[in-house]
Amino acid sequence: MSRYNVRETEAKWQAAWADAGSFAVTADPAKPKYYVLEMFPYPSGRIHMGHVRNYTMGDVVARFKRAKGFNVLHPMGWDAFGLPAENAALEKGVHPGKWTYENIATMRGQLQTMGLAIDWSREVATCRPEYYRHEQKIFLDFLKAGLAYRKESWVNWDPVDNTVLANEQVVDGRGWRTGALVEKRKLSQWFLKITHFADDLLEALKGLERWPDKVRTMQENWIGRSTGCRFFFRMSDGHPDLEVFTTRPDTLYGASFVAISPNHPLAATLAAGNPALADFIAECNRTSTSEADIETAEKKGFATGVTAEHPFVPGWTLPVYVANFVLMEYGTGAIFGCPAHDQRDLDFARKYGLPVKPVVIPEGQDPAAFAVADEAYTGPGVLRNSDFLDGLGVEEAKAAAIRRIEEAGRGQGTTMYRLRDWGVSRQRYWGCPIPVIHCPKCGAVPVPEAQLPVTLPDDVTFDAPGNPLARHPTWKHVACPCCGGAAERETDTFDTFIESSWYFLRFADPRNGTLAFDPELVKYWLPVDQYIGGVEHAVLHLLYARFWTRALAHCGYLDLAEPFAGLFTQGMVTHATYQGTDGKWLFPAEVEFREGAMVKSDDGTAVTVGPIIKMSKSKKNVVDPQQIIESYGADAARLFMMSDSPPDRDLEWTTAGIDGAWRYINRLWRLVTEPGFDLPAPGTPAPASFGEEATAIRRLAHKAAQQIGEDIEGFRFNSSVARLRSFSNGVQDAFAKLAAKAAAGTAPAADEAWAAREALEMLARMVEPMMPHLAHEMWVELGHAGLLLDRPWPAVDAALVVEDTVTVAVQVNGKLRATINLRRDAGNEEAQAAALADPAVQKAVEGKPLRKVVVVPNRIVNVVV
């Protein structure tokens, strides 16, 4: 037997696939297409185990679909703009572009060693001008269509990165990347009008049946449609009417205060003459901006001294507070508080000694006795203490209150969304320049299309915080395209989520220098049939990509409803953490198990083993994929990633697991190279018939082909590996019997040898999606020329996957007495004889005359005595 040389084998087949251009594809209307895409990586320097798992999943699907006859598009690119490159410039003194392109080269090489079936001819990097020139053109078209605009607004400011964050990039009040507490600032920003499509984005979620429910729910909650009423309070002291939005107009008679956001225009007006209020507003703007944090934080308010008149009762006034829990970004930035029926309002009212008046009483309770203590009542009930609403249910009362408001001309029923327009301005260098010029005479002027792309200057410095473009001595100074006068370029760059909002479209036509993409190629390839990535992108990238697709359709670029037909969110790769006696984190390679305890390898000192968590550079619980590939090979890494856990759950990395994968690869190799008997030559015609032993081998193979195919289709990769192992074990057992016969001088019958070859060939084909290098080497070892990946998935003989035996129930006078196994084609006499021969049946009929036996083929035998 030749020893399986993993390094030589994997390098050989990777070169063979590259030389043959095996994974390069073109649109072919004669073939069904399949577009599989994993979320493209940020080129941070080296791939990690999360990449290995993610891209292995996509590759298994791509290779399987190709084997099933699909024209498969499986591309790769780089989400290459972003702050880490600027941070590297600060820390290492290297230009962001140089750092990025070097990382791309490193990571491309690493991914190629994984043996991925990727069409590298379609590779894109979003930091290249040939990519982002189209992005700039798209933005200008959005501007013309009214889908992009500029306004002054309160923004989330990351004080560490010195840049603006979208609401979606604020996690628990902190910047999604730096973890710094986010502040509120007012800046002129560019926005994309995602709210224009809010209804469609929400309603279309129902049709995304191949998306995880949790992702659809997250997007639904983020869009946050609320049906209610907008109306205004008349204000004291000559202040303008105050508009509020509420989903509970039925509780207006329970109102005890009005609250406005610290960023509301009225708050600014009042603070101008009130230093204490100004200080309170400043304090609010220094604290967390996330809704989750605001919901749980202490409720604080500042009594302004201004009052608001109740819309239904002239002369009834409510005190107006500036409150830290009212968001300017939601509704109108003003609310009325009904403490009895809203927990947040109740907490606020208790703190500031405001009235708590129940107006919704649970069915069957005495209104005079019902009271609210520490918990607001938010359930159904009947209106009380509410004048014309008394006696109505909650929904009826809402409708009646809205009618009264509309009749009085003080507001109207309406629908509001939690979703806000997407602020896309970022104060950083390494991003796509926004193609606008600011002229003191002409205002904001789009850069003429002929001048695109607006590229970044190379001569920048990072020796001070903030945006180098704003400090550049020459780049930003240009002539106005309209009047020719002195003007300045926009120095903000795009939020990098813009690049990832359309890259999947560019892959359909990546070398088009004129258009972002040919609509006909998009029509052929899109939507992405299977998208794979982390659930953490549910309300960032995935929502933005859905919006961008709609905006492009609105502007005539394409005719596509949704970008991703199927979505799969994979689990993380995890590992235990290790700390030395000094509290410092240790890499797994620095520790070992010795005499019943984990110790440091170098000095034997004790190691504290921590929880199994997501692999993290900061805690050093990482394993370098490159070292694993060099030691065990890509196929072993791929197999382990598919083996031990359902793909949507976390996978714990273990040395035992990768060792087991390597041992299995060698078992498969021995099965092909040492069957223990002679196989017929490749292409030998099938025998006219097959005996029992040959049929058993064939049945194993054909069942495995069917079941493994179904498992891959259903993303049950761990099950497909288990079935593969079961199949190979069955083949090994069958071969052992045939080898024993051969050793005894009796060669296997022709039908048995033919079935053995068929099983090995089918095994190689089934191995290929998961362990492609090994599979190709097995194919050659079996005497075949050419590439295995060009062969179809094994055709399944339906007769071989039908069980040849069935379990039949035996009843005596209608009572179940036994079950028996019969041949599927057993006749009535055979079934009757088997039933009456069963000991339990014989005991039940003993001494009783037999009247008749009724046989329902393959289901039941009923004995009547």
UniProtKB/Swiss-Prot annotation:
Main location: cytoplasm
A molecular function GO annotation: ATP binding
PROSITE patterns tied to this protein: AA_TRNA_LIGASE_I (PS00178)
SUPFAM superfamilies named in the record: Anticodon-binding domain of a subclass of class I aminoacyl-tRNA synthetases, Nucleotidylyl transferase, ValRS/IleRS/LeuRS editing domain
Cell location: Cytoplasm
Chain location of the short sequence motif 'HIGH' region per the record: 41-51
InterPro entries hit by this protein: aa-tRNA-synth_I_CS, aa-tRNA-synth_Ia, Leu-tRNA-ligase, Leu_tRNA-synth_edit, M/V/L/I-tRNA-synth_anticd-bd, Methionyl/Leucyl_tRNA_Synth, Rossmann-like_a/b/a_fold, tRNAsynth_Ia_anticodon-bd
Domain of life assignment: Bacteria
Keywords for the protein's UniProt record, in alphabetical order: Aminoacyl-tRNA synthetase, ATP-binding, Cytoplasm, Ligase, Nucleotide-binding, Protein biosynthesis
Entry GO terms, CC: cytosol
Residue span of motif 'KMSKS' region: 614-618
Keyword Calcium carried by entry: no
Binding site for ATP: K617
Annotated NCBIfam families: leuS_bact
Name of the featured protein: Leucine--tRNA ligase
Originating species: Rhodospirillum centenum (strain ATCC 51521 / SW)
Gene: leuS
